Amino acid sequence: MATTATMATSGSARKRLLKEEDMTKVEFETSEEVDVTPTFDTMGLREDLLRGIYAYGFEKPSAIQQRAIKQIIKGRDVIAQSQSGTGKTATFSISVLQCLDIQVRETQALILAPTRELAVQIQKGLLALGDYMNVQCHACIGGTNVGEDIRKLDYGQHVVAGTPGRVFDMIRRRSLRTRAIKMLVLDEADEMLNKGFKEQIYDVYRYLPPATQVVLISATLPHEILEMTNKFMTDPIRILVKRDELTLEGIKQFFVAVEREEWKFDTLCDLYDTLTITQAVIFCNTKRKVDWLTEKMREANFTVSSMHGDMPQKERESIMKEFRSGASRVLISTDVWARGLDVPQVSLIINYDLPNNRELYIHRIGRSGRYGRKGVAINFVKNDDIRILRDIEQYYSTQIDEMPMNVADLI
């Protein structure tokens, strides 16, 4: 077991400056034994997996992939912290696929994610990367037919990705057998280990074989989460990014001062006219606000789509499909969208409401400049929000300036 003291020591950690196009000036504070593997070819991956990786469009591993994949494949417990858009999902997906015995038709890896959408995205990514391996992978998520889950699991799945509640339900019903599980992956661990999911994760963990390897991946890892990892990780390797480097480079952040809540809507309409947007996401803090704003925008003849956690699964899926394809250009959403959902064309994020906690800020704005693409984030700030904005600035050691008149030129 690693102790908290070991976690905190910088003696066993060194800082590395990476000089890569899209990862300039990101300082890793990383365990000594982590080395860099610059190409997929030199990672010792199976041939059919390499084919899948190149067919998927990957050419060169990202900074996190160069460090984490080999460690995970070696069987080490790993805490990997990487910003949104750096390829962290592919990091554990490639590692999981490498470790499977395809001949054995039993669940060998379990991936937990905080939202249904993210679980489905992970499943699709695994199937695409494992295209030449004949891998079976099922997304086990709430809001879908339990009978279908049971049928799929009975058929035999090498990997199960899912939300903690439904996964635990399937384990309890003995539909998801855990005896062959070798690896547990917690994606977006900061969100997962927040109060809501902590108990469910422990419930699932108790059913896993004692030697199960644990991999924890997230954009932010607050101190209290590192403390919790002590409970179920053994001597984990750390691959961490310093917190104050976490705001993505290439994303310009601005604020617009709106004295009162009522003024936000007009501000949004004014912006909408100014910006010939490729694709944008507008974040609100509540489902009710998402519905209200969507209706109001449509009344004003703006075309928008919207999504939040109360919508039926099918509806959310078709909205995401529409948005990904570019058929809808502006999406109004709650934080359900902020977690790891991958739409490369998004170049503008508007925080209609500042997020309720500062950890969420990076998940939201990390959307808009994926894989080193440029992006713009605009925060609507009421008089009594100034304090929250300053807190976010301080927390991420970043600067958020007042929005200039020529903001359209920056997108």
Curated annotation (Swiss-Prot):
Residues covered by the Helicase C-terminal domain: 250-411
Modified residues (Phosphothreonine): 163
Subcellular location: Nucleus; Nucleus speckle; Cytoplasm
UniProt tissue specificity: Ubiquitously expressed.
Residues recorded with modification Phosphoserine: 10, 12
Similarity remark: Belongs to the DEAD box helicase family. eIF4A subfamily.
Disease with which this protein is associated in UniProt: Richieri-Costa-Pereira syndrome: A syndrome characterized by a unique pattern of anomalies consisting of microstomia, micrognathia, abnormal fusion of mandible, cleft palate/Robin sequence, absence of central lower incisors, minor ears anomalies, hypoplastic first ray, abnormal tibiae, hypoplastic halluces, and clubfeet. Learning disability is also a common finding.
Protein name: Eukaryotic initiation factor 4A-III
